[in-house]
Amino acid sequence: MIDLLPDILSHLTQLDAPVRTLYPADFTQLPCIVLTETANDVFARADGAPHLHEVEYTLESWASALSQTHALAAKLDEKLSALGFSRTYCCDLFDAATRAHRRVMRYRALCDEHRIITQ
C-alpha cells in the first residue's frame, strides 16, 4: 500500500494554519486544516503485482470566517496541484454548533510503486 501522507504533510508546513490528521478538539483554535486519506486502491497491475495506485485525500480548511476558509483553500489547492494531484470535489459547509466554517476538498492522483505521481 502506498502512503503519500508524509509527503503531503511536508509540503503543507508553510501554511498559516496547523495541519492535523484529526478533527479539531477545540474549535476556539481556528483556523486549522484537517487532512485524511479517503481512498487507497490498486488501479492497475503488471505481472500480477500492483503497479499503479489510486489515492484520494480529503482536506478541510476550518475557520471562523468564510473568507479565511477560501484563502486557506486557495493555498491548499496550489500545494496539492504542484504535487500532481487533481481536485475532484469542493464544498462549503457551516457547523452551527461550533459556529465554524469549513471548505471540504478532495484530491486524487495515480502513483506507481516508487511513489511517483502520474496523471
Which sequence ranges carry the predicted segments?
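Residues that cap or initiate secondary-structure elements
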Residues: F27, A39-D41, A65-S67, C111-R115
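Oligomerization/assembly interface segments of phage tail-like spikes and tubes
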Residues: H51-S64, H101-D112
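Short, solvent-exposed beta-strand/turn "edge" segments of beta-rich domains on protein surfaces
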Residues: A46-H51, A96-T98
